[in-house]
């Protein structure tokens, strides 16, 4: 299992390679708030790249509640996952919609399972790599036997990282 980061904005992440179990990663990552130091310690592979973002970090507005069913970024044909009947609840539909909402234009993200997002973007050379965790990143988890998971970093405050998420066949929206 490994976690990688896609960055929406001029904010970056870089962590060292660590060996961990899936159980410990999920236990740490999906707690209410995760310390940046703990998150660093539990990652096996982590990399990041940066997207150009229209909104700067100063104007970034964290999403701490579910988008309404009338929000066009999540619940319309603007969202490719919604368009092809893979909409909410679904982590990829949510993260795609959130990226669209942040950027204000269509994101250059994979239309496939979450585990393919990082490699797709890296292979196409869309984004730069960085070093410091900030808001707007898309965390990408990949593990054996599943389609992976993606979530969006909404806050990094006092060493705590807050992610917004959705889950396939699960919750439409939740924070971790």
Regions found by a protein language model. Name each.
Residues 23-27, 55-57, 88:
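Composition-driven, intrinsically disordered low-complexity tracts enriched in small residues
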Residues 170-176:
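A short macromolecule-binding patch
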């Amino acid at each position: 299992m490994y976690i990688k980061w896609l960055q929406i904005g001029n904010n970056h992440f870089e962590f060292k390679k660590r060996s961990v179990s899936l159980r410990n990663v999920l236990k740490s990552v999906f707690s209410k708030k995760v310390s940046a130091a703990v998150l660093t310690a539990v990652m096996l592979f982590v990399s990041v790249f940066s997207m150009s973002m229209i909104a700067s970090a100063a104007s970034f507005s964290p999403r701490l509640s579910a988008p309404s069913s009338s929000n066009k970024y999540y619940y319309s044909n603007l969202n490719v996952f919604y368009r092809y009947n893979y909409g909410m609840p679904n982590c990829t539909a949510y993260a795609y919609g959130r990226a669209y909402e942040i950027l204000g234009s269509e994101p250059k993200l994979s239309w496939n399972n979450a585990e393919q997002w990082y490699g797709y973007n890296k292979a196409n050379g869309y984004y730069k790599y960085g070093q410091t965790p900030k808001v707007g990143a898309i965390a990408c988890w990949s593990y054996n036997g599943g389609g992976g998971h993606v979530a969006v970093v909404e806050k990094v405050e006092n060493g705590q990282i807050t992610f917004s998420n959705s889950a396939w066949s699960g919750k439409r929206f939740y924070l971790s």
